[in-house]
Amino acid sequence: MKKILLAIAVLMTAFSVDAQTLTGREIIKKVKDNPDGETRYAKMDLVLEKANGSKRERKVESWAMDIGEDTKTMMFFTYPGDVKGTGFLTWNYDEIGKDDDKWLYMPALKKTRRISGSSSKTDYFMGTDFTYDDMGDRNVDEDDHKFLRMETIDGHECYVVESVPKDKREIYSKRISWIRKDCFMGVKVEYYDKLGKLHRALNISDIKQVQGFWTRGKMVMENVQTKHKTILTFSDLKFDLKIDGEMFNVTKLEKGL
C-alpha cells in the first residue's frame, strides 16, 4: 500500500511540475506558433447584440496569407446591403515598434480610410466589440508574460497567463488568457483597463481540427462595461489554398469582390 501511495504521490508531483515547466512567455509563444497554414479562407457571421437584446447581423468573407513572420489579410462584407462591399485590408508586421498598415474602404462614400496606429487601438471595427488592433497579432515580446496557475474550463486543463504591455501607452493595463494545455488554443481572454477594471471578455468555443489545423469555430467578445457583445461564427474554413498575393493591395480593396 505504501508503495502504491508513493507512486501516486510521485505521479501527482510530476504532473504538477509538468504544468509549470513552461514560462508565461513560452506558453504564449506556443499559441502564436500554432500551425495554421500559409494561406487561409473563411466565411464569418457576426451578430452585434445590444444590452437591450436587439441584434444586427453582418456577413464577411476573409482571405489571409503569411509572408515570413508577417501576415496580410483582406476582408469584404457581403451582407446586409448597407455595408455590402465594405472592405478591410491589413498588413500585420511582427517587428516590434512597427505599426501595422490598415485600410478601410467604404463604398457608399467611395472613400478609403487609413487606420492610424493610435486609432487602431481605441476605435472599434465596424460597430463590433473588436478594436482594429484586435484584427492582428501582437509580437510575443511586446508584453511581459507571467504564468499564474492552472484551471479547468469545459473539461480541458488550461494555463492561465497574465500579459502586461511593455509600452505604457497601450490602452489596457493587462490581459489574462486561458490556454488549453492539449492544443495551445486560447479559450478565454480578459482585458483590463488602466484602472484595473475588467473592460472586455473574449470567450472562444467550438475548437476543432480542420485539415489538420486547430481552429476556432466561435468567438464572443463582450464589453462588460456597456453590456454590448459581438458573436462571431466561422464557417467554410480552408487552409493552404491557392491565393494570389497581389490581391492584398488598396486597388483590389477598392475594386471589391
Regions found by a protein language model. Give the residues of each.
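Sec-dependent N-terminal signal peptides
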Residues: 4-13
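Sec/Tat signal peptide C-region and signal peptidase I cleavage site
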Residues: 15-20
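N-terminal mature ectodomain segment of secretory-pathway/periplasmic proteins
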Residues: 22-108
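A short, amphipathic edge element
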Residues: 25, 56, 135-147, 196-201
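Short amphipathic beta-strand and strand-loop transition segments with alternating hydrophobic
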Residues: 62-64, 146-152, 205-207
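Gly/Pro-enriched, hydrophobic low-complexity segments
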Residues: 78, 89, 101-105, 111-116, ...
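Short, solvent-exposed mixed-charge patches
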Residues: 256-257
